[in-house]
Each structure stands twice: as structure tokens, then as C-alpha cells.
Swiss-Prot record:
Protein EC: 3.1.15.-
Entry's Gene Ontology BP terms: DNA metabolic process
Protein name: Oligoribonuclease
GO cellular component: cytoplasm
Taxon lineage: Bacteria, Pseudomonadati, Pseudomonadota, Gammaproteobacteria, Pasteurellales
InterPro entries: Exonuclease_RNaseT/DNA_pol3 (IPR013520), Oligoribonuclease (IPR022894), RNaseH-like_sf (IPR012337), RNaseH_sf (IPR036397)
Residues covered by the Exonuclease domain: 9-172
GO molecular function: 3'-5'-RNA exonuclease activity; nucleic acid binding
NCBIfam families in alphabetical order: PRK05359.1
The family this protein is said to belong to: Belongs to the oligoribonuclease family.
Length: 184
């Protein structure tokens, strides 16, 4: 049972064929909704976008290796979903939990994801509040102010969108307790 709430947070992660939205495309989108205290309320659909073999063959060696090992390239080839279909399915899920414009975009390095959303999924980009809740900001502050903390939180780095979101939420919980020193 969904619960529409202005305080709920939308976590998103994209996997792309590269880092340049002028040349690269989105290949996977996942979302999770948490309450304000970072408790997971719902996991959205993990959606794979079909892209051409030509585009996939132009990916960097790192992308080809990573997305072959995690199975994403094969799922992209098998998918029948367009970027627009993925965008609409994601928005339909989010509407159950968070009103449009209420939640900042949450995750790690979300400015990069937002660049791709503006280019290829503008309605989804517009669903978010203009603010960002970027876990990588705390990571950068910890790197400068408390570097010994960085090795205390280990990520698996599967480069699968849903796994990455779960890790981002856990990472923010870690920083909340050990860096910001707020107990929940």
C-alpha cells in the first residue's frame, strides 16, 4: 500500500553507455522511495532501455567489461523498452509515493544522472525538486575533514542501478551516524 507524502525521498540511479550525454545514452534506470529517515518504503521497477548494437559497440573498454560482467549489455539487447516507456513507467511508480516537485533527486553524483535525464527523459527530470541530495558531497567532505572514515564504508560497485541505490542509502546512513553524528 503506497503512502503519498511530501517528505518521502526519491532515490535514482542510471547506468549509461558513457559519461557524455551528447554522445551516450541511458541503458538502465532504477528508483527507490524512502521516508525522511531513510527507511525503504518501495523499490521501483528496474528498467532496461534498448539501445542499438552500434551504440553499445562504441562504449569504452571499461563500460564494455563492466556491463558484460554484470549482464547489463545482454539485458539491453533483449529489452524492448524505449527511453520514453522507461520514463513513463518510472513516473507512474513515483506518483504513488511522492508528489511531483516534492523530492530532491537523491543518490551518488546525481548531477551526472540529471544531465542525462534532462536530455533523454525530461518529464522524469522535471518530476524532481530542483535541489539535490547527493551522498557524494558528504564523501568529499569526509575525504578532506576525516579521511580515516573513507575506508570504513565499503561498496560493492556492481554498477547495477538498484544495487547502487541501496548502497547510496546505506552510505548516507553511515555518514549520518559517523560523520554528522546523528543517531536514528
Amino acid at each position: 500500500m503506497s503512502k503519498l507524502d511530501n517528505q518521502n525521498l526519491i532515490w535514482i540511479d542510471l547506468e549509461m553507455t558513457g559519461l557524455d550525454p551528447e554522445k551516450e545514452r541511458i541503458i538502465e534506470v532504477a528508483t527507490i522511495v524512502t521516508d525522511k529517515d531513510l527507511n525503504i518504503l518501495a523499490e521501483g521497477p528496474v528498467l532496461t532501455v534498448h539501445q542499438s548494437n552500434d551504440l553499445l559497440n562504441k562504449m569504452s573498454d571499461w563500460c564494455i567489461k563492466t556491463h558484460t560482467e554484470n549482464g547489463l549489455i545482454e539485458r539491453v539487447k533483449q529489452s524492448k523498452l524505449t527511453e520514453r516507456a522507461v520514463e513513463l513507467q518510472t513516473i507512474d511508480f513515483l506518483k504513488q509515493w511522492v508528489p511531483k516537485g516534492a523530492s530532491p533527486i537523491c543518490g551518488n553524483s546525481v548531477a551526472q544522472d540529471k544531465r542525462f535525464l534532462y536530455k533523454y527523459m525530461p518529464d522524469l527530470a522535471d518530476y524532481f525538486h530542483y535541489r539535490h541530495l547527493d551522498v557524494s558531497t558528504l564523501k568529499e567532505l569526509a575525504r578532506r575533514w576525516k579521511p580515516d572514515m573513507l575506508n570504513a564504508f565499503n561498496k560493492k560497485n556492481t554498477h547495477l542501478a538498484l544495487d547502487d541505490i541501496r548502497e547510496s542509502i546505506e552510505e548516507l546512513k553511515f555518514y549520518r551516524t559517523h560523520f554528522i553524528n546523528l543517531e536514528k
